[in-house]
Each structure stands twice: as structure tokens, then as C-alpha cells.
UniProtKB/Swiss-Prot annotation:
It is found in: Membrane. This is Putative transmembrane protein At3g54730. GO terms for cellular component: membrane. It is a multi-pass membrane protein. The chain crosses the membrane at residues 97-117, 128-148, 154-174, 186-206, 221-241, 292-312, 335-355, 362-382. Keywords: Membrane, Transmembrane, Transmembrane helix. Residues 10-25 have a biased composition (Pro residues). Residues 10-45 are annotated as: Disordered. It comes from the Eukaryota.
Length: 387
């Protein structure tokens, strides 16, 4: 463990390494990068440091253990206008699980009230026990961002990093950088502040920060490529369904139109009441429902595929004795998971259309027979001239 504390003074002092630093003062990869020679002169302090209080402390804490847990906590009061003060990420083996419960986010927000939020020394600690709590918090994040219009980009990028802590490389490959337009700027500003504090350690800190962001880069790409796609697809599907329900609820409350509450997962209401509509409108009505069921099938296949990993570990704790689940998972892996999902999607779409077409035929027949029966009853029991 390495702990470096720098007290702010009227002129920023230079943090020099000890003449004979112990071998455990820094992690092994950083000791080889830091030179024992005299460091260069520090840069001139920025304008916003002039007149700042001397009571603040800038703390940089780096810790690395054999279990793979990494902790980086930077409390930098250099820019007092930023709402974001520090990010604390604590997790063991990021590349093995979906570590939402072991992440912690710190940012300075004066008026934030939420069950997951606790105040501590002017900062806010956000902790949760499951994915649903985190997802609910960040689903309502726009209402919190409205209080801080100047920091919305920083908070949005931080929330995406919390939801997907270990998929930065996957997000870049999936062209999802559009969701994080200021992601690089945030990292650059944090790295710049660290370099101003510790100019002689800037190379080692940058490399250590990159290792924290992408530990076991090759393993992530090889092992979690398909699982990351499944998680992202499930999130996108859930967001899309939630957005549709929210829009329909708004239509019901504003326009008082109960017909707009009909979910897209089912057929349109006019499809049954108007059996003589054109074939184009009927086919479009089929696709409206089958398209939504397609997303449901895709998410179910993704979750079903991911469920084999914990089941296999429980069924066969000894890797030398493969179980039936391992062979079945390898058989599924022989086929492309994306291809299986697309096939299931098409199957559900055509089954949906075929089912409702087959269901509509007896419905139309019953309506026609009822109409003919009522007409015959009227003709037999009532006279035209009123006799």
C-alpha cells in the first residue's frame, strides 16, 4: 500500500521521494518507472489556486492486494466549482462478475435525497445491494441533473461507468461512445490534476490508472464479449419498453384516451373490431406486436445462455470432471449465440403472426354466423309490413 499526502501551502511544495525508499513503498510496476533522480520543477500554479484556503488536503491513496481488489480515491479541491469530487471504485475481480454491489461513487451534491445515498463529510456515498436499486437510481438521474445544469455531462458519464465498469473496450468496439461524449475530457481533467500535484509520478500514475480501467484486457475481450452484448441488449430492451409505457401513461393522463394504453406487446384493438380491414393494415398490426415480442425473445435467450456459467460451476466444481451442462454449453457455443437469438426472434415473429391469423379466422367465422343467425331470426319472427 502506498499513501501520499500533500498539504497545500501558499507556494505548492514539491513532493520528493525518500533517499532510500523501501521496496514496498509503491507497487512493483510503479517502482520500476519512478526514477530516484531529482524531479523537474513543478509547473506554475493555476489562477484558481491563488487565494485558496490552506486548510484543504489533497490525498492520493493507491492500494493493491493479491485478491485483485483495487482502490483509487482522489480528493482534490483544486476546482471548487465542480460537483464531482472523487470516484471510489472498490471491487474484486472485475472481469468475473457483474460487480454493481461492490462499487461506490462519491460526488459532492448539496441537495440530493435518495434511500441509497448517505452523507459523509460533505460528500455523498452511493451504495446498493442489487442491480435493480442502481438501475432505478440512474433511471431517475435526469431529475437530479436538473439541479446541476453545468455538471450533467460529468454525472452522466460517471453513471454509465458505474453501470458498466469493465466494458470500456467493449463499448468502444460497439460504437457506443456517442453515449459518453465527454468521457475522455473527464479522464483528462482528473489526470491533469494528479499531474499538477505529483509531476514526478505522472507516468506511473497514468499507467496505473489504465490498468485499473482495463485489467486483464485480453481476458475481457475473449471471455465477456458475448455476455457484454447480452447485458447491453437486455438493458436497451428494458429501456425501450419502459419508455413506451411512460409515453402511453402520459397520453392517458393528458388526452384521457384509454385506447392508447394498449401495450405494443399485443395486437391493436381495432384489429378485432374491424375484420374487413385491408391486408396491409392487418400485416402492419401483426408486426407491431411481433416486433416487441422479438425483443423479449432476444433477452430471454441472452439470459438463458448466461445462466449456464453459474450452473456449470455449481454442478461441476472440479474442472477435471466435466458435467452434462458443460457439454450442453459447448454445444450451444458451437452455434453463434447471435444467430440463435436471431433465429428465435424470427421464430417468435412468425409464430405470433401465424397464431393471430389462425385465431382471427374462427373469430371472423363466429361473427359472420352470429350476424346471419340474427338476420334469419328477425326474418322469421317479424314481418316487414309490421303485421
Amino acid at each position: 500500500m502506498a499513501l501520499v499526502m500533500l498539504a497545500r501551502a501558499p507556494a505548492p511544495p514539491l513532493l520528493l521521494p525518500s533517499p532510500n525508499p523501501p521496496p514496498c513503498a509503491l507497487p512493483q510496476d510503479l517502482t520500476s518507472l519512478v526514477s530516484p533522480s531529482e524531479p523537474p520543477d513543478p509547473p506554475d500554479p493555476p489562477d484558481y489556486l491563488v487565494g485558496a484556503s490552506n486548510s484543504f488536503l489533497s490525498i492520493l491513496l493507491l492500494r493493491s492486494s493479491d485478491l485483485g481488489s483495487d482502490l483509487v480515491q482522489a480528493l482534490s479541491p483544486l476546482d471548487l466549482g465542480f460537483a464531482l469530487r472523487s470516484i471510489t471504485a472498490v471491487c474484486s475481480s472485475w472481469y468475473q462478475v457483474f460487480p454493481l454491489a461492490c462499487l461506490e461513487l462519491w460526488f459532492s451534491i448539496p441537495h440530493l435525497s435518495h434511500p441509497l445515498v448517505t452523507l459523509s463529510k460533505g460528500f455523498v456515498s452511493l451504495k446498493g445491494s442489487n442491480f435493480f436499486e442502481f438501475f432505478t437510481f440512474f433511471w431517475n438521474m435526469p431529475s437530479f441533473i436538473l439541479q446541476f445544469p453545468h455538471h450533467e455531462d460529468v454525472m452522466i458519464s460517471t453513471s454509465f461507468r458505474l453501470v458498466l465498469p469493465q466494458y470500456e473496450a467493449v463499448m468502444i468496439l460497439l460504437k457506443l461512445k456517442l453515449f459518453l461524449p465527454h468521457y475522455e475530457d473527464v479522464l483528462f481533467s482528473i489526470g491533469l490534476r494528479i499531474q499538477l500535484l505529483l509531476p514526478q509520478y505522472e507516468v506511473g500514475l497514468i499507467l496505473y490508472k489504465l490498468r485499473l480501467l482495463l485489467p486483464h484486457y485480453e481476458d475481457v475481450i475473449q471471455k465477456l464479449w458475448l455476455r457484454a452484448i447480452h447485458v447491453i441488449v437486455s438493458l436497451v430492451w428494458f429501456l425501450e419498453i419502459s419508455r413506451r409505457i411512460k409515453e402511453k401513461t402520459y397520453d392517458v393522463l393528458t388526452r384521457n384516451d384509454l385506447g392508447s394504453w394498449t401495450p405494443d406487446l399485443f395486437i391493436e384493438k381495432w384489429w378485432f373490431s374491424q375484420p374487413h380491414t385491408s391486408p396491409k393494415l392487418r400485416f402492419f398490426s401483426h408486426l407491431v406486436g411481433s416486433r416487441s415480442w422479438c425483443f423479449v425473445a432476444y433477452a430471454i435467450v441472452a439470459v438463458f445462455h448466461d445462466a449456464f456459467y453459474p450452473l456449470e460451476d455449481v454442478a461441476s466444481p472440479d474442472s477435471r470432471s466435466p458435467s452434462v451442462l458443460s457439454y450442453f454449453r459447448k454445444l450451444i457455443s458451437c452455434f453463434s449465440t447471435i444467430g440463435v437469438s436471431n433465429f428465435s426472434c424470427l421464430t417468435v415473429m412468425y409464430v405470433f403472426i401465424f397464431f393471430f391469423r389462425a385465431f382471427r379466422m374462427p373469430f371472423v367465422a363466429v361473427v359472420s354466423l352470429a350476424f346471419v343467425a340474427s338476420l334469419m331470426y328477425l326474418l322469421n319472427h317479424f314481418s316487414i309490413v309490421g303485421e
